[in-house]
Amino acid sequence: MAGHDVQYGKHRTRRSFSRIKEVLDLPNLIEIQTDSFKAFLDHGLKEVFEDVLPISNFTDTMELEFVGYEIKEPKYTLEEARIHDASYSAPIFVTFRLINKETGEIKTQEVFFGDFPIMTEMGTFIINGGERIIVSQLVRSPGVYFNDKVDKNGKVGYGSTVIPNRGAWLELESDSKDITYTRIDRTRKIPFTTLVRALGFSGDDEIFDIFGDSELVRNTVEKDIHKNPMDSRTDEALKEIYERLRPGEPKTAESSRSLLVARFFDPRRYDLAAVGRYKINKKLNVKTRLLNQTIAEPLVDPETGEILVEAGTIMTRSVIESIESHLDGDLNKIVYIPNDAAVVTEPVVLQKFKVIAPTDPDRVVTIIGNANPDDKVRTVTPADILAEMSYFLNLAEGLGRVDDIDHLGNRRIRAVGELLANQVRLGLSRMERNVRERMSVQDNEVLTPQQIINIRPVTAAVKEFFGSSQLSQFMDQHNPLSELSHKRRLSALGPGGLTRDRAGYEVRDVHYTHYGRMCPIETPEGPNIGLINNLSSYGHLNKYGFVQTPYRKVDRETGVVTNEIVWLTADEEDEYTVAQANSRLNEDGTFAEKIVMGRHQGVNQEYPANIVDYMDVSPKQVVAVATACIPFLENDDSNRALMGANMQRQAVPLINPQAPYVGTGMEYQAAHDSGAAVIAQYDGKVTYADADKVEVRREDGSLDVYHIQKFRRSNSGTAYNQRTLVKVGDVVEKGDFIADGPSMENGEMALGQNPIVAYMTWEGYNFEDAVIMSERLVKDDVYTSVHLEEYESETRDTKLGPEEITREIPNVGEDALKDLDEMGIIRIGAEVKEGDILVGKVTPKGEKDLSAEERLLHAIFGDKSREVRDTSLRVPHGADGVVRDVKIFTRVNGDELQSGVNMLVRVYIAQKRKIKVGDKMAGRHGNKGVVSRIVPVEDMPYLPDGTPVDIMLNPLGVPSRMNIGQVMELHLGMAARTLGIHIATPVFDGASSEDLWSTVKEAGMDSDAKTILYDGRTGEPFDNRVSVGVMYMIKLHHMVDDKLHARSVGPYSTVTQQPLGGKAQFGGQRFGEMEVWALEAYGASNVLQEILTYKSDDINGRLKAYEAITKGKPIPKPGVPESFRVLVKELQSLGLDMRVLDEDDQEVELRDLDEGMDEDVIHVDDLEKAREKAAQEAKAAFEAEEAEKATKAEATEEAAEQE
């Protein structure tokens, strides 16, 4: 027998084919969320308060200090927050101290600082009743970056930028004439020596002394001449900088000094953050810059005078390690004193070394280090600026190297805690202005912290972040895997990140540093590809937000691969050679081969075993959780694997799911950590268990009660249902499953089912990836899922009186009310169809809502009582089902409702959806298709033992897609079904072909793993042998019920009067430009005319056509489309006198905006007016006629007389 048995939890054993022993268990998969939020509550929030406070008033007589804060118990429990549409948050109280410096009086007071959303154990937040996730953001790390660029003449120039966490950028660049310039905050450039002079080193000789002699320095000094002898060089430099930063303002040296201090050296305006300081010290440190260079002068210990390194020595890693303590100490430290006019007058400490230029052995190059300022220094220092300039000048001499901004050593992750801290900081800095003004305006004697603090800006900032930030997302709750993936997602988008349009190919591409940190496979298809990534399975954040991955340390002396685990970030890993996890080892832990496959700085090749420093801990450390759930991933093309990983996240939870026969061993861990299952918090013994709760008695006698969720609606409208797994008397340990969540079986993730699949064509029904399915899957509810939809109705106060929820609905028969209770609300358990009333509701009717007849009746009988119209909540199209639950919220019961709302009723309708033609199915290898035909069981092909096949797939879907993993899974699945076992074949360490064939043989299958199939309709065998086996197939969330849609009479767009589009708007089908071309090509003029008029936006035409159809008359000619009129009016509004003429050059009258709206409807008053008007018109016409007759008579008389 190939493989060995492995136990997953207490309920499942799998035969595993892995050969590599795992030395490290997977970490908790949602720790990126939970650890970050915990760190925020423990110290992040405190740091933010300490950053902004203390606040002094303008005269510096009063000061507000921060003392501490306390988070109290949440107002609602998790469940209550969900039900009441509230947020799961806890009140936070902050203690402040207000000090009056004149009198010495101190007032300490605790101030309520708003409700702060609290993370649940599952790593989510509940905001306004909806479960949300804060996605971690991938951003460029603060620090100093060097880049190279080639100009049009092929000359290489360099550039450098200091990027802070917040504050002004400082850039260096060289031009084609080899002059070096600096830019401050993206303004115009100035020679870099100008900035050096402003820092207090004004003489040319001083500049050469600091940087050494080089062509770039010489050219720049020549360019930077002393223009105004009245000013000192430093003052002149300061004025020149001020002119660049504030053009047009009067420039003085003093204002320039204060401006530069504010821009770079004031911790409130400029912040590198801990990570920026770490990155700058790492980049500008002399240790890394001296590596492999030849030293040009002896290095002497300043205390003892002992020569540590002779001149001419090559500084290898071992040499540098031997003098590391001296390099970190005072070796070659030089103190420069700036002149008195400088921006910062403190002495500048630099570390200075001379090395032989790599390009020219006769030249000596100066290297300047920043002497490692302390971690507490969060602004840039003059030493940093000078060291950056030195590094920049060294690049031209062939020392140092440029940075790759897509390297994960230069990109870091802002997780929840940091994103929240930034929001609070934003709110506090807005509050600070407010506080300062109130301190200055009000009387000092009576002020208390409570009076001067307005918490509105802080709570608003936090609320806005959770409610509407791009990174605060509605949780993807299709199934446990999609929840887990969402929590581990890394987005490069969002505030302070990239935008889709600007992100180029390089940012999106897979980088060699992604190995073990970010998954190279799981990313969306489409515009976000490569911008949204997933953390790899072992990935972990360090304190600076860089992703680390674990490696086993190799002992260089003995060559033994130890079990000591070292976590490395991407830039640390660059210094070492790492062997792959599948390198063969001897019993004693040494490498079995002299040459092993390994990686060094992104180069994958064979390395001698004796130079390897580390080894991967596991083959699956490369990929994310969803990708690690694909068996035989190593046999799939990466594009299809990407689809497979993404589609597993869209699986719909089924009624009775099955774990896959062929898994990867990842199913248990994914289900355990997803947060969808109920997990034991402590050891104990089960004392009570039913479908709704489980009670566990701990060793110390205390009782834990676990509540089981039944058929709750998830964010994506599926049923979130948990099933108890334990019985009374069971002993549970901490971390054991107490109940399965949705899409789980026996503590393992179970997204789909294990049907018998045959690769064969059948009557052409599986053309283009379509899926043919047996009716058994419908009858036995194999792919049936439950969906819950929520509908709500609220009563408001209107101008004409309050709306009411009632059974008394006008013009509705008793039959429609049969399932409503005495209040007019549907009973739980009622079966409802489209159009049925869920909540009976009436709204008072205004006078203007009444028809002419009703007004007449009111005028005669004075009956005002039934002036209501029916505004009941009815079942929308396609939402038939069973009423699962009804929730009623009223002000009387103390529920918080929006203003103006008196009562809110929510009705939940459950639907059982069986699989049907048009639903989308998929395997785990990116093999997706739509169900094209459901065939009766008796017509399906059957195996020699009489078992009918469940699903038929097209064999042509395999070769061109290159996802051969599905075929391996098929054969192994059949063997597993025959043997009655479950199998684990971990990614990159799974079953080999030998394992596969030996298992097939063990199961007694034929040697080619194919079989004879018989046609179910005729009983004849098919000509060729067919591959039949068990493949794990899932039903995806794209169901035909949600997509099928037809419009009859529906809404029109206001401006163009064309039908709306889309199912949600009950819209029509767009007949676009190309479709019009098709009709034109066929010469179908009448069809074309009616599509562009009646069926679209000819308002009068469509009314008349409707009337004609209903009355059975011929349809009249169409009129002018509304959108044409809109175009004419638009052109007229631009001042073009545009008119429409007919063939006789007569102007065609276009309908005016106010015409033609309500021509048939007429009110009683208008009727009276119309009658009067008609009478007057008739009278006037009569009089005119009489007058005409009289004139005619006169005319005839006159004519007679003349004769």
Curated annotation (Swiss-Prot):
Domain of life, per the record?
A: Bacteria
- NCBIfam families (alphabetical): PRK00405.1, rpoB
Composition skew (Basic and acidic residues), residue ranges: 1174-1195
Q: What is this protein called?
A: DNA-directed RNA polymerase subunit beta
Query: Which family does this protein fall into?
Result: Belongs to the RNA polymerase beta chain family.
Outline what the protein does.
Answer: DNA-dependent RNA polymerase catalyzes the transcription of DNA into RNA using the four ribonucleoside triphosphates as substrates.
Instruction: Return the Pfam families for the record.
Output: RNA_pol_Rpb2_1 (PF04563), RNA_pol_Rpb2_2 (PF04561), RNA_pol_Rpb2_3 (PF04565), RNA_pol_Rpb2_45 (PF10385), RNA_pol_Rpb2_6 (PF00562), RNA_pol_Rpb2_7 (PF04560)
List its EC numbers. 2.7.7.6
Q: How does it assemble?
A: The RNAP catalytic core consists of 2 alpha, 1 beta, 1 beta' and 1 omega subunit. When a sigma factor is associated with the core the holoenzyme is formed, which can initiate transcription.
Class of enzymatic activity (EC top level): transferase
The cellular component terms of Gene Ontology attached to this UniProt record, alphabetical and capped at eight, are: DNA-directed RNA polymerase complex
Which cysteine pairs make disulfide bonds?
Answer: none
Source species, please? Answer: Streptococcus pneumoniae (strain ATCC 700669 / Spain 23F-1)
Q: Which PROSITE patterns match?
A: RNA_POL_BETA (PS01166)
User: Which parts of this chain are annotated as the region Disordered?
Assistant: 1174-1203
Keyword annotations from UniProtKB, A to Z: DNA-directed RNA polymerase, Nucleotidyltransferase, Transcription, Transferase
Say if the entry is tagged with keyword Transferase.
Answer: yes
